[in-house]
């Protein structure tokens, strides 16, 4: 990590040096050239009312809020699909930056020929909301693609790269469409809000500032409020609903669009979003599920999302119960997982010469190690757990923890 940071800093310095050199050459080559007076009016056909400009500015702020909130939520969700938080963040960042670049480039080819810019901005926002809610179910349904990779030759030295590459490309493909749409919003708002050539810098600077400020609040609210209060799946639906509402408001208040066209567009897009949201919530299609869970799970017994992790208890096809954190099975009734907890409790105390020691455990899991420690003459057991949902799942494993949470010598520290 440190070396990568040094490399990034060095590249930034090289870029800065190259820009200074190019600027110096440009100044020398432009000496003696008489500046041309620019046209004052930007594009007469693009002129919109000040009310529409204000609406567009509010929309880009709320759009920035939704975009960065979705980035946080998708990063959290992709940990299940990519099995690695670093890969998840890298994939999301790649999708966002590539999508913004492609979206801006695509809309730039048509923006000067469009008349109803407020309507088109609203349509883009509605599509962002719809595709944002579809992203996680589409990723979840791509498990057969990953199963095909899993059946490849395990002796292939390139298998880890192929495995990671397949998941990266699949995820990038799913996330690219909503991020391309997000990339279209800034040029449209810039076109609406910019009135004359003389005010291009001021207008675009204001649009960029409002969009960035919305993004700051979006990332903070998603991580510190939405996930703890609603969980990831409900937060995705809430943010997608906000995106859709932004689009509906813009379409309804666009004076350049016929009233019938506005009503039909709003009714169709709003109805589609409501149907999708209700279906996915009812069917549990937005539940975060890793490849291992989807292959092994026969029945989900408990599912709880929190700010630290998503904790799930499920029964596999052999009838065993497993506890998974962010998609990784960490404890359960299978013989291998159960036996792995016993040495954690017994070995240190069998070797310790301290009479009646105070014992500290890091991580509760299913509670097997905590119960094992209490079988010895210990004064107290302090167990430190970072994820509140983990001890909440203890009720599903009485055969492992034997009700250790109610033991007077046991102290759970959150």
Go through the PLM ranges and name each one:
Residues 1-414:
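Alpha-helical transmembrane segments of multi-pass membrane proteins
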């Amino acid at each position: 990590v440190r070396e990568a940071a040094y490399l990034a800093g060095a590249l930034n310095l090289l870029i800065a040096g190259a820009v200074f050199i190019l600027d110096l050459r440009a100044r020398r080559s432009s000496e003696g050239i008489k500046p041309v007076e620019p046209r004052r009016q930007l594009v007469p056909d693009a002129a919109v009312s000040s009310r529409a400009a204000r609406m567009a500015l509010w929309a880009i702020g709320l759009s920035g809020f939704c975009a960065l909130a979705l980035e946080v939520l998708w990063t959290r969700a992709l940990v299940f699909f990519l099995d690695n938080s670093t890969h998840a963040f890298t994939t999301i960042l790649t999708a966002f930056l590539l999508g913004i670049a492609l979206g801006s480039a695509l809309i730039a080819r048509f923006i000067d020929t469009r008349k109803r810019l407020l309507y088109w901005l609203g349509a883009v926002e509605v599509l962002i909301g719809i595709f944002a809610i579809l992203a996680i179910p589409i990723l979840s349904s791509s498990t057969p693609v990953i199963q095909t990779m899993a059946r490849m030759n395990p002796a292939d030295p390139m298998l880890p790269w192929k495995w990671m590459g397949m998941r990266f490309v699949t995820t990038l493909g799913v996330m690219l469409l909503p991020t391309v749409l997000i990339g279209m919003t800034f040029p449209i708002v810039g076109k609406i809000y910019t009135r004359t050539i003389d005010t291009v810098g001021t207008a675009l600077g204001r649009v960029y500032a409002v969009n960035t400020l919305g993004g700051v609040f979006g990332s903070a609210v998603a991580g510190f409020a939405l996930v703890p209060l609603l969980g990831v799946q409900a937060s995705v639906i809430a943010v997608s609903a906000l995106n859709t509402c932004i689009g509906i408001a813009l379409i309804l208040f666009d004076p350049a669009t016929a009233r019938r066209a506005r009503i039909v567009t709003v009714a169709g897009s709003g109805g589609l979003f409501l149907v999708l949201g209700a279906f996915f919530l009812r069917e549990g299609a937005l539940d975060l599920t890793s490849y291992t869970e989807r292959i092994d799970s026969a029945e989900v017994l408990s599912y709880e999302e929190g700010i630290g992790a998503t904790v799930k208890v499920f029964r596999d096809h052999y009838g065993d119960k497993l506890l998974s954190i962010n998609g990784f099975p960490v404890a359960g009734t299978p013989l291998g997982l159960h036996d792995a907890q016993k040495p954690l409790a017994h070995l240190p105390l069998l070797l310790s010469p301290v009479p009646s020691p105070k014992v500290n455990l890091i991580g509760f899991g299913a509670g097997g190690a905590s119960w094992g420690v209490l079988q010895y003459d210990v004064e107290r057991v302090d167990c430190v757990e970072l994820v509140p949902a983990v001890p909440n799942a203890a009720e599903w494993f009485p055969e492992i923890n034997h009700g250790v949470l109610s033991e007077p010598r046991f102290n759970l520290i959150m």
